[in-house]
């Protein structure tokens, strides 16, 4: 089968012929239809410091996908050939304290699809049945391909009650944009999103945010005033991983404000802990998706009319992967999709 492979410990990817994956008794073999390109894939392609520490070559990349089941192991009883499916990209041990308590997203031994084991940038991918999400109602293929990052957005945005709240989102990348759509759909009063990319801020305006603010020339405090806020934001969703974004968010929260932090900083950085303490601000780290409550929430949101179409801005056949990755790395658009049927 064809697959995008990190063949060598150096920058680049290689489209290669590799053996089709074999499945065990509890596994599912899936014919991949479409995949989404994630920031993680960009890191592995560029072979930065994180990738050099996390990845062992050769490796098939990719963890965002939608496909069709073609074969199931003998112990799989609730998934059948022909099912349209996506996959939870975090494979957990099932034995630790958190796994046994049903908190699988907190497993200390998590292995990432397309990072710690061969992934979905291929014509076929194999997964444990416990990681397979069957789409019981029709979902657009492009949207189904990005259920993994959509889940990150949903997990972050729904960490705290949103109805009637004023929400600040720092970072208008694809996950930030999806979080903004979720916040609006879930009943937030105001949703302000910040970035330095006018192209991405324009996407945010199409989603329907209250204010899309370019922090290269306007402060968050100015945005507050434009929205008529007197005491700061109730909810903060930090999606950028930028130190200055987190510091500005803390400075613009109301007393008792709550922050969900998905953005992953590249290094340690100082924050105003005195402000956090005296303003009684709650900060919650977010990683991945709750299994499978977040997946249920995603399906319900889409059934309820949530529109993610503006977030998907690039579509390519898998053989045009170089152009697709360049598009995804440009920082100017939303999600980029690879079609494995072309």
From Swiss-Prot:
Pathway: Amino-acid degradation; L-threonine degradation via oxydo-reductase pathway; glycine from L-threonine: step 1/2. It comes from Streptomyces avermitilis (strain ATCC 31267 / DSM 46492 / JCM 5070 / NBRC 14893 / NCIMB 12804 / NRRL 8165 / MA-4680). One of its GO terms (molecular function) is zinc ion binding. Catalyzes the NAD(+)-dependent oxidation of L-threonine to 2-amino-3-ketobutyrate. It is found in: Cytoplasm. InterPro entries: ADH-like_C, ADH-like_N, ADH_Zn_CS, GroES-like_sf, L-Threonine_3-DHase, NAD(P)-bd_dom_sf, Zn_alcohol_dh. Zn(2+) 2 binds at residues 93, 96, 99, 107. Its EC number is 1.1.1.103. One of its GO terms (biological process) is L-threonine catabolic process to glycine. Pfam families: ADH_N (PF08240), ADH_zinc_N (PF00107). PANTHER family: L-THREONINE 3-DEHYDROGENASE. It catalyses: L-threonine + NAD(+) = (2S)-2-amino-3-oxobutanoate + NADH + H(+). The record marks 148 as: Important for catalytic activity for the proton relay mechanism but does not participate directly in the coordination of zinc atom. This is L-threonine 3-dehydrogenase. The gene is tdh.
